[in-house]
C-alpha cells in the first residue's frame, strides 16, 4: 500500500538531517512527494511539495554525482508537469530540460526529448520564443531520436535473439521497449 503521508515524515527527517546517509533518500523521495501532490487539493501545500521535489533532484546531484544529465531530465520533466500553467514555470522547465539535453545528447531519455519539445512549443505559443527556435530544436531532436530509435531497435532485437535472459536483462529489454514506444509518441 502506498501511504505517502506516513512515509513522508521519516523520509523528510533523513533528507534534512542526514542527506548523505543513503541514495535511497533520492530514489524514493520523488515517489513519496508526487504521491502527496496527487492526493492534496490544498494549492499552497502543492506548491511547497513541488519546491521540495525540485530540491530533491538538486540535492541528489550534489551528494550523488555521476548522473547529472539524467537527474536534470527528471527534474525538468516534473517541473513541466507541475509548473506548465505559468510562463515562468514553462521557462524554468525548458531551461532545465535544455541543460539535460545538452549534457546527455544522444543519451537523453525519450521523456526529456518529449517534454523539452512540448515546453518549447508552449513558449512559442505564448510568444516567448520564436517559431525559428522550435524549428531549430526540432532539427536537433530529430537527429537524437533517429539515433536512439536505431540503437534501441538493435538492442531489442539482440536481446530477443538471446535464449534465457537473466531477470536483469529482461528488465532492460522491457525498459528499452518502453523507451522506444515513448520515442514514437
Regions found by a protein language model. Give the residues of each.
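Preference for long, solvent-exposed alpha-helical segments and helix-linker "stalks"
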Residues: 1-185
